Swiss-Prot record:
Phylogenetic classification of the source organism: Bacteria, Pseudomonadati, Pseudomonadota, Gammaproteobacteria, Alteromonadales
GO MF entries: GTP binding; GTPase activity; guanosine tetraphosphate binding; ribosome binding; translation elongation factor activity
SUPFAM superfamilies per UniProt: EF-G C-terminal domain-like (SSF54980), P-loop containing nucleoside triphosphate hydrolases (SSF52540)
Alphabetical list of InterPro entries matching this protein: EF-4 (IPR006297), EFG_III/V (IPR035647), EFG_V-like (IPR000640), EFTu-like_2 (IPR004161), G_TR_CS (IPR031157), LepA_C_sf (IPR038363), LepA_CTD (IPR013842), LepA_IV (IPR035654)
Residue ranges occupied by any tr-type G domain in the UniProt entry: 2-184
Matching PANTHER family: TRANSLATION FACTOR GUF1 HOMOLOG, CHLOROPLASTIC, TRANSLATION FACTOR GUF1-RELATED
UniProt-listed Enzyme Commission number(s): 3.6.5.n1
Sequence similarity: Belongs to the TRAFAC class translation factor GTPase superfamily. Classic translation factor GTPase family. LepA subfamily.
Record-given protein name: Elongation factor 4
Protein residues bound to GTP: 14-19, 131-134
GO annotation, biological process: positive regulation of translation
Length: 596
């Protein structure tokens, strides 16, 4: 056991952790050179295309150190994007240490900081590594000082390496062996294994990635899941070398997989504890807190026949992504669908893209909203995440919106732009600290403003240098109202949104103008109105197409022309009473892109 090292790599997006993991695998001979693909661990197509890591993956490598001993390194790759910090906390729960990888050209960024604090809170040993020292703009001394200044861990003798060229990889491995503690646990105690991740394989059923904390799990053992009490047989246990490799048993401190032919999807929830069915442990391991969705959106299939397959797809996906939550929803405009809770907008895009890609569905998403706390006049408290569930104004005592604490790191030359952006988003400045060239800002910002497009705007006002990390702190009373869109006097529920009263006119006008461009002209006038309660705040009209009925009259009497025009007018009026307007797909998407 003292030769096992469990660690993960924490880094900001694009600081090179996937490349570094490739090198570690290569040096330890996990794969032959022929099988070595770039970013081995980013196995999803989507991950490769966007160049980001979404799912945590694990690998077990054997490394022969300079002192002649052979160590087993279990290493878990983690995502770096702010939306996936939950995946990171799960990976860290299974480790004793973490490599903090920092790009020697870029320096420390907010996300690195957030994940690093998570690691330090869990009492992990954090080992700084300066990556990309082959770049001409690398300044290892400055960055090492920055790590000490901002993060507060010893970094003067941090390992310097370049994952791309392979320089310094040996030192990284030596440092892991020297600095990261070996796992603690009792091989004789009853089995306790933490489920770090689980996914569905259509051939094997549910595959669970586990970390053995105490005891031993042998192939063929009967084990039970502690939260559900269900028992299964361990058909196969083994490790990833990135390929699956069966073993006779998983010992204390190891990280590996268990396949037990679990068919139903929620059979092995992530964060749960496995123990033996006979002589099991009394209490489960402290898991990690459930991730709470920050953003909600209705998702509907374009053709109603896909509803069943959409539901199955969501079930399979939610197995793989523990933070996904959903419930059925119906809309008069879009039919049947689901209300899905996401961690953030990137998460939302990725889930939608995975559904469309891996399950071949055509989907349409309504505008994302956050969860509001509503105090009713009779003293009840409701939580509303769907604008159409909001009670009428006269029943509402007060609306409270979620406030998040946003920590922003930005180079000082872009400070002005970022502060302007935060004020525009109704933010309140709480703190501002200078660290060398960087400024750390802390703002309280309404969650609704952050989830829409704050991240993209922040990146664009600071040329990509600012970085953001946020977490929910409290609900705060706010003057929020529901903006409805009426088309020919009919409410379209899927277009409603909850916004702040100060934005009504601005948003309302922008919305109706956008809809006017997108709704095709009919044979009659279409009135598009934006209203709050019964008060219309903006309107525009899609003019009717008309036939020139007087074209065949030449000269002649004016009353003849009047008669024809009058007849046309009556026809249009009758059509307008009967006609209903199709709202095209683009119109729903336009609501999402209003701010641009």
């Amino acid at each position: 056991m003292k030769h096992i090292r469990n660690f993960s790599i924490i880094a900001h997006i694009d600081h090179g952790k996937s490349t570094l993991s490739d090198r570690l695998i290569q040096v330890c001979g996990g794969l032959t050179d022929r099988e070595m693909a770039e970013q081995v661990l980013d196995s999803m197509d989507l991950e490769r295309e966007r160049g980001i890591t979404i799912k945590a993956q694990s690998v077990t490598l054997d490394y022969t150190a300079k002192n002649g001993e052979t160590y087993q390194l279990n290493f878990i790759d983690t995502p770096g994007h702010v939306d996936f910090s939950y995946e990171v906390s799960r990976s860290l729960a299974a480790c004793e240490g973490a490599l903090l990888v920092v790009d020697a050209g870029q320096g420390v960024e907010a996300q690195t900081l957030a994940n690093c604090y998570t690691a330090l809170e869990m009492d992990l040993e954090v080992v700084p590594v300066l990556n990309k020292i082959d770049l001409p703009q690398a300044e290892p001394e400055r960055v090492a000082a920055e790590i000490e200044d901002i993060v507060g861990i010893e970094a003067t003798d941090a390992v310097r390496c370049s994952a791309k060229t392979g320089v310094g990889i040996g030192e990284v491995l030596e440092t892991i062996v020297a600095q990261i503690p070996s796992p603690e646990g009792d091989p004789e105690a009853p089995l306790q294994a933490l489920i770090i991740d689980s996914w569905f394989d259509s051939y094997l059923g549910v595959v669970s990635l586990v970390r053995i904390k105490n005891g031993v799990l042998k192939k063929g053992d009967k084990f039970k899941v502690m939260s559900t009490g269900q028992a299964y047989n361990a058909d196969r246990v083994g490790i990833f070398t990135p390929k699956m490799k069966d073993q006779a048993e998983l010992k204390t401190g190891q990280v590996g997989y268990v396949i037990a032919g679990i068919k139903e999807i929620h059979g092995a929830p992530v964060g749960d504890t496995l123990t033996l069915a006979k002589h099991g442990a009394d209490k489960p391991l402290p898991g990690f807190k459930k991730a709470k969705p920050q953003v909600y959106a209705g998702v509907f299939t374009i053709s109603t026949d896909d509803y069943e397959s959409f539901r199955d797809a969501l079930n399979k996906l939610s197995l793989n992504d523990a933070s996904l939550q959903f419930e059925p929803e119906t809309s008069s405009a879009l039919g049947f669908g689901f209300r899905i809770g996401y961690l953030g907008l990137l998460h939302m895009e990725i889930i939608q893209e995975r559904l469309e890609r891996e399950y071949d569905l055509d989907l349409i998403t309504t505008a994302p909203t956050v969860e509001y706390e509503v105090l009713l006049t009779n003293g009840e408290t409701l939580y509303v995440d769907n604008p159409s569930d909001l009670p009428a104004t006269n029943y509402i005592e007060e609306m409270r919106e979620p406030i998040v604490q946003a920590n922003i790191l930005v180079p000082k030359e872009y400070l002005g732009n970022v502060i302007t952006l935060c004020i525009e988003k109704r933010g309140v400045q709480k703190n501002m600290v200078y660290h060398g060239n960087q400024v750390a800002l802390t703002y309280d910002i309404p969650a609704a403003e952050v989830v829409m497009d704050f991240f993209d705007r922040l990146k664009s006002t600071s040329r990509g240098y600012a970085s953001l990390e946020y977490n929910f702190i409290r609900f705060e009373p706010a003057d929020m109202v529901r903006l409805d869109v009426l088309i020919n006097g009919d409410r379209v529920d899927a277009l409603a949104m909850i916004i702040h009263r100060s934005n009504i006119r601005h948003k309302g006008i922008a919305l109706v103008d956008k809809m006017k461009e997108l709704i095709p002209r009919q044979m009659f006038d279409i009135a598009i109105q934006a209203a709050v309660g019964n008060q219309v705040v903006a309107r525009s009209t899609v003019k009717a197409l008309r036939k020139d009925v007087t074209a065949k009259c030449y000269g002649g009497d004016v009353s003849r022309k009047k008669k024809l025009l009058q007849k046309q007018k009556e026809g249009k009026k009758r059509m307008k009473q009967l006609g209903n307007v199709e709202v095209p797909q683009e119109a729903f998407l336009a609501v999402l892109k209003l701010n641009e």
